[in-house]
Amino acid sequence: MTNWDTSSIQIYDKVIERKIRYNTTIVEHSCMLLEAKNQNIVLFHKIGTSFTMITDQNKLTIHEGSYTLAYYWKDQPYNLYIWRDKNGNYLGSYFNIVKNTCLADNLLSFEDLIIDVVVFPNGDLY
């Protein structure tokens, strides 16, 4: 059974997103809680370092100062990131296939299964 407790967090609280990669390394991001419901939460994360995802035919760069709206669901094998620039313009989306999404206190954690879908601004998928 997945641990999922929204009772101890409030809107605008700091929440740590902890991603456990397939190779067991851990990546953490400090986020702000935007919404918490029984079955899902939404986090906000400001991008501190630019990064680029490159495919055979496309490239998606998320620049420093852009932000992520991150959606997580209890008992669902995925999460969703929507990226926007500092002016709110859509940059792209990222569906992350995961397992063991847990929320306890101010920590959201999940195990990344490497299978992802990137949606580019023009609608192309990878």
What are these regions (language model features)?
Residues H29, F44-H45, Y81-W83, L125:
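Intrinsic disorder and flexible coil segments
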Residues I54-T101:
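The feature represents the first ordered module of a protein
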Residues I26-S30, G65-S66, Q76-L80, F110-I114:
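Short, surface-exposed coil-to-beta transition loops
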Residues R18, L34, F44, Y81, ...:
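Residues in well-ordered beta-strands of folded domains
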Residues M1-Y67:
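Charge-rich, low-complexity N-terminal segments
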Residues I20-Y22, A36-N38, G48-S50, D85-N87, ...:
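Generic structural motif
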Residues M1-T2, Q10-I11, E17-R21, N79-S93, ...:
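Generic hydrophobic segment detector
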Residues N87, G92-Y126:
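Conserved, surface-exposed functional patches that form binding/active-site neighborhoods
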